[in-house]
Amino acid sequence: MSKIVAVTAGAKGVAHTHLAAEALSATAQALGHQIRVERHSAEGVEAPLQGAEIAAADVVLIAADLRIEDVRFVTKPVYRTSTARAVTQTAAVLAEALALTGEETPQMTTDTGQRPLRVVAITSCPTGIAHTFMAADALKKTAAARGWEIAVETQGSVGSQNALSAAQIQAADLVVIAADTHVDDSRFAGKKVYKTSVGAAVKGAAKVLDAALAEGVVLGTNLADTVDALKAQRAATRSGPYMHLLTGVSYMLPLVVAGGLLIALSFVFGIKAFEVEGTLPAALMAIGGGAAFKLMVPVLAGFIAYSIADRPGLTPGLIGGMLAVNLNAGFLGGIVAGFLAGYVARWLRDAIKLPRTLEGLKPVLILPLLSTAITGLIMVYVVGTPVAAILAAMTAFLQGLGTTNAVVLGLILGGMMAVDMGGPINKAAYTFAVGLLTSSTYAPMAAVMAAGMTPPLGLALATLVAKNRFTAEEREAGGAAAVLGLSFITEGAIPFAAKDPARVIPSIIVGSAITGALSMALGCLLVAPHGGIFVLAIPHAVTNLGLYALSIVVGTLVTTGLLIALKKPIPAEERARS
């Protein structure tokens, strides 16, 4: 008689979960085996397995149609199959699972064969010279001694080395972050993550790995977390200039938001109140327009360069961006400066070879000096003046748009915001609008934000007024989609579009395009690039507030109407169990 612990999880509702559980229980008991089944469904986890039960088990059987974390079963043989096979071929599934109990050294397995535990790790310390690499070596040696597969990304003073790929992260069972600096963990959404200090990994890698298995935390799986995971997956697949540009934009955004809203607040006291020196409006204008807005382009350039060359790119990028401001080259000059500084710094970093004893001079002396000099001279003598002329011409054209041309531009920008919901096309429209804020051109920003809000809002409204066209899971997600839409997070529409792209995507594109066109036609202006409905409460953040809200409402209603027209009603039985 063998002791079996099992987990069942159907991808659609509770039916498959319970059918598989009952089939396994009945068949195992008929064969004289002990079995305990943990059931996963949309309603939560039923009858969770206890540590003592897992420890006493001879084998673990996972019948699931979605990913189930199996790190807690690391010391046991684990057999995986689908819920459908567990229902239709129960005896064969049990026989194949029990065949694993004869292994001398039980390892995590799948129904395609054995495999060791897969770990990905990041190590980083403030100085980045010694402890980063010592921690990486310690984790590698300890994992190898246990027969585990491990990949370690080091984030040192000369940038990231052995960067983890999206495929490595996707395949990993466990993530370990040993760092004394901030490490972005958004790309590990849905994974079991354990964080510790770099010193702990150096002094006790074995303890760190043991603690990671026992204490690691899995990121959540509600709609908001799903959206975050999708965004992280998209970020992981970005490469080349597109990735570098979006990195710069993401770091620039807080400055644009803070600066724009402070400028708007200065107008509360009167449109020209800031002209009186020593007053609060003058101070707010100095902070927002005089400081925050002046830093926008340098930060954009600095972090484009940082994305390309890591830390060595930051100094020449920031200085190149400041030169772009001084040369009136604006955000276009900042983009050029960022890419120039990044590639120059990366080339110097790779080309300059020093003895190990002098390696510490590269990040603090040699690279900043040479990369800044080269970038600065090219900006001053080659790039600055032509780019400034291009920016001036583009700004004059946009500010002189007639109503018809403004509507066309709004249609294009609005549609782009909904095409891929946070993807490259969406980000191209958004980056274009944000960049124009530095030239005091605010209409495209208003159109872009309004158009980015309507996809999740339209879907959320549709789940309320046309419940027979959505599953229970989708109807439940509608509330979260509404919050994401109000917050200007277009990605809230992705889970709906992924399930029914042929009907959802055309509906949201039309709704967003109409919203963008209305916003431009009605002369709406927006000085802040983010915030959704929450920024509308700030006086003077939006010009023509009532008409702007009307644009969003109309686009939302159009989206909802098209969804109702295109989506067919779902049978009642399927709506109830999905």
From Swiss-Prot:
It catalyses: D-fructose(out) + N(pros)-phospho-L-histidyl-[protein] = D-fructose 1-phosphate(in) + L-histidyl-[protein]. The keyword Phosphoprotein applies. The keyword Membrane applies. It is found in: Cell inner membrane. InterPro entries: Bacterial_PTS_Sugar_Transport, PTS_EIIB-like_sf, PTS_EIIB_2, PTS_EIIB_2/3, PTS_EIIC, PTS_EIIC_2, PTS_IIB_fruc, PTS_IIC_fruc. The modification Phosphocysteine is found at residue 125. GO terms for cellular component: plasma membrane. Its EC number is 2.7.1.202. Induction: By fructose. Residues 241-576 form the PTS EIIC type-2 domain. GO terms for biological process: phosphoenolpyruvate-dependent sugar phosphotransferase system. The active site is at residue 125. The chain crosses the membrane at residues 251-271, 284-304, 319-339, 364-384, 405-425, 428-450, 477-497, 518-538, 545-565. GO terms for molecular function: carbohydrate:proton symporter activity; kinase activity; protein-N(PI)-phosphohistidine-fructose phosphotransferase system transporter activity; protein-phosphocysteine-D-fructose-phosphotransferase system transporter activity. Pfam families: PTS_EIIC, PTS_IIB. It is an enzyme of class 2 (transferase). It is a multi-pass membrane protein. Residues 1-99, 119-214 form the PTS EIIB type-2 domain. Keywords: Cell inner membrane, Cell membrane, Kinase, Membrane, Phosphoprotein, Phosphotransferase system, Repeat, Sugar transport, Transferase, Transmembrane, Transmembrane helix, Transport. Gene3D superfamilies: 3.40.50.2300. The phosphoenolpyruvate-dependent sugar phosphotransferase system (sugar PTS), a major carbohydrate active transport system, catalyzes the phosphorylation of incoming sugar substrates concomitantly with their translocation across the cell membrane. The enzyme II FruAB PTS system is involved in fructose transport. The PTS EIIB type-2 domain is phosphorylated by phospho-EIIA on a cysteinyl residue. Then, it transfers the phosphoryl group to the sugar substrate concomitantly with the sugar uptake processed by the PTS EIIC type-2 domain. In the N-terminal, the PTS system fructose-specific possesses a duplicated EIIB domain (EIIB' domain) which lacks the active site and functions to facilitate phosphoryl transfer between the EIIA domain of diphosphoryl transfer protein (DTP) and the EIIB domain. The presence of the EIIB' domain is required for normal high affinity recognition of DTP by the PTS system fructose-specific as well as for normal rates of phosphoryl transfer between the EIIA and EIIB domains of DTP and PTS system fructose-specific, respectively. PANTHER family: FRUCTOSE-LIKE PERMEASE, FRUCTOSE-LIKE PTS SYSTEM EIIBC COMPONENT-RELATED. NCBIfam families: FRU, PRK10474.1, PTS_IIC_fructo. This is PTS system fructose-specific EIIB'BC component.
